[in-house]
């Protein structure tokens, strides 16, 4: 079971501890320990839209759904073995029945943790094949000016830039070891360039993994992020 103090710290960092005390989401996570909580939307802040309709906490997210967050908004949700923290001004689409392992990040920023099994993430600049990972994505601009920030926080990935498929890389990380920017600009000497760790934390990853009954690989090692 996750130590109460560390889990509460992660939940507070994600803005889930309010003046009313422990929310239903937090009670479920603490009470079940390593057991996953029910699927669906577990935090709705601001304007969150699912399939062109305003979303509510507890709502189920299904294959084929599109989730959109407005300004100063955020959504935390669970789909099967996977959990997501979708930040403001972000649009994400999940593949339908025949493409349940496909996720499209159309715009914005999202932190995700995935269970065992292969998944494919499509972004404006690349196709990202993952397995049992935590990752953070930010999408910027469109067309030739598009740029994607990608941090494989831990796990395995096969990353293929759309503008230069021959530069595809397959690698593994354990703790934010290889963040990068992926470009669409053919004038650049390389489409993938090193980056820093930005805009996501180990506490947020701890929260998401707790919601699906897991722990990040770096758990208890003295987080730097």
Predicted regions and their residues:
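Flexible, surface-exposed loop/linker segments and immediately adjacent secondary-structure boundaries
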Residues: 7, 11-15, 22-63, 70, ...
